[in-house]
Regions:
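A charged, aromatic-enriched C-terminal amphipathic alpha-helix characteristic of glycosyltransferases
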Residues: 197-231
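A short hydrophobic beta-strand element within the catalytic core of glycosyltransferases
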Residues: 135-136
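Carbohydrate-associated surface elements
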Residues: 15
Length: 238
């Protein structure tokens, strides 16, 4: 904004309540996984997005194919919608040809941030994350990256594509992630496999990421920036 118009601005990032870890309803989350036919020994690779071409979900399909283990299941949390179904149909066919067990959740998810809005929906993303083993987020571009922040909040390892906003605003914070540059390499697949098979390494990774996010994307950060903005606009400090 400053470069194009000369107007200064303050960027308020997406935030989550990192001061308080997520409250997990074990009965609810177990019921969710059972409802889509998964077993306890299945390794759940979760793509927590809608099926849209810019999400680059074909890379997640390729990842599961190259991990080459029948225990690995790819779960996409939202169906296609207003953007059309051509990509979704192609993606499902591609997964079938590659021998990837792909599950697309076709129930409407309630908003975990507004639980009273959609009371008829019995599940939300907060039921998905707790038992996920790995998160894929190979988006081509994003405004910010809600799924990235949610994965960190639930202490899940993830694969992320280095889209422009990530490179500019998130990567400099020093998160410990498995990153790809527009395509999946054997080295990247090996890193994913190592994380999935090494609990100690995985725990160190996700705990480090949680601590970093708490410093930069917590409610405390939001409160601080709002106080600064109020002081700038009105000369007061709340």
């Amino acid at each position: 904004l400053a470069l194009r118009t000369g107007i200064s601005s303050i960027i308020i990032p997406n935030v989550l309540d990192f001061e308080n870890p997520p409250q997990i309803n074990e009965k609810q989350t177990e019921a969710f996984w059972q409802s889509i036919g998964l077993q306890k020994n299945d390794v759940k690779i979760v793509q927590p997005t809608r099926i849209i071409q810019r999400k680059g979900i074909e890379h997640a399909v390729q990842l599961v194919e190259e991990l080459d283990d029948p225990r690995y299941k790819l779960i996409i949390t939202h169906e296609a919608g207003d953007e059309g179904f051509d990509y979704a149909n192609w993606l499902k066919e591609d997964a079938k040809q590659r021998g990837v067990d792909l599950r697309v959740i076709n129930i409407h998810m309630s908003d975990p941030m507004n639980p009273d809005v959609n009371q008829k929906e019995t599940h939300s993303l907060w039921d998905v994350y707790p038992h996920a083993d790995f998160i894929t987020y190979p988006s081509l571009y994003e405004g910010f990256g809600n799924a990235f922040l949610e994965a960190v909040y639930f202490k899940k390892p993830l694969l992320i594509n280095r889209y422009a906003t990530f490179v500019q605003d998130i990567e400099p914070k020093g998160f410990d992630l498995i990153a790809m540059d527009g395509y999946l390499t054997r080295k990247t697949v090996s890193k994913v496999k190592a994380i999935l098979e090494t609990p100690e390494h995985r725990a160190n990774m996700v705990n480090t990421n949680y601590d970093i996010a708490a410093q930069h994307y917590s409610y405390a950060v939001l409160r601080r920036w709002l106080n600064i903005m109020l002081a700038n606009f009105f000369g007061i400090n709340r």
